[in-house]
A protein has these predicted regions:
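N-terminal non-catalytic structural scaffold regions of very large proteins
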Residues: 1-250
Length: 250
């Protein structure tokens, strides 16, 4: 479900977003709807699917936990496990982190599609800032506990818990795991590559670079956040509330 939905947003929703921007009055011959109307119905239909997916995952997770394979949170770790994770964070995770502060001197960085980030609303001397912490691709997504390997915790959950430590100079007002999906509907034709051939590899690399920087079509967050916090994402990514989805399951 998740990978199919990703592809649907990247290609179909991406294509509709392009059409909505170029020709707002054009109607689809099959549905009789404009691109904007189709997008509205898609967003409305997709939101409850997230809840169904999360409920299905929770059911499977409970059944796995019953037979000993248990996904943990920082709050559910035993004292010795908390000590292990604290050392693991200090020795393995912290050295490869690249936290970023968004303010008047540091513009909002480009976020690649389908890359997890910890986003934190920060406060210092009555001034709010946004903190971003990419989840490093070099780290394993899952950390298994040494004494009982059937007990594990997600790396993103560790980072979310330690966001207060990473941004220790600030008060962390809110935080969430953040993931954006970008439009990937790039039209490739003979003109793009040239009928004469040429360096296909360089042209494909250019297309892939273009794909990574295309418009955001979906924003996923791991927990409910305030409308004030959402505004950072709405304004930066130029998305509506309908494009911000609560996704409790990674």
């Amino acid at each position: 479900f998740t990978s199919n939905l990703d592809e649907f947003f990247m290609i179909r929703v991406g294509s509709l977003c392009d059409m909505a921007a170029v020709d707002k009055e054009h109607t689809d011959s099959k549905s009789g709807l404009t691109a904007k109307e189709q997008l509205h119905l898609i967003y409305k239909a997709v939101e409850p699917l997230y809840a169904r997916r999360d409920a299905a995952f929770s059911d499977v997770d409970s059944k796995l936990s019953a037979i000993g394979l248990r996904r943990l949170t920082m709050d559910s770790l035993a004292p010795d496990e908390q000590k292990y994770i604290k050392r693991y964070f200090k020795d393995i995770i912290a050295p490869v982190l690249s936290p970023q502060i968004v303010d008047s001197h540091h513009p909002f960085p480009h976020l690649e599609g389908k890359v997890l980030h910890i986003a934190a609303l920060l406060s210092h001397k009555k001034t709010e800032r946004l903190g971003l912490l990419p989840v490093p691709a070099s780290l394993p997504p899952v950390v298994f506990l040494p004494e009982t390997p059937s007990r594990y915790i997600l790396t993103e959950d560790i980072l979310l818990a330690y966001a207060d430590h990473v941004f220790e100079m600030y008060d962390v007002l809110e935080k969430t795991v953040l993931c954006v999906t970008r439009n990937a509907d790039i039209q490739v034709d003979d003109e793009t590559f040239g009928v004469e051939g040429g360096d296909f590899r360089k042209k494909m690399e250019k297309l892939l670079r273009q794909r990574r920087r295309m418009a955001v079509v979906r924003v996923e967050i791991s927990r409910p956040i305030s409308d004030h916090f959402k505004e950072y994402f709405r304004s930066r990514f130029e998305v509506s509330d309908a494009q911000i989805f609560l996704s409790r399951t990674a």
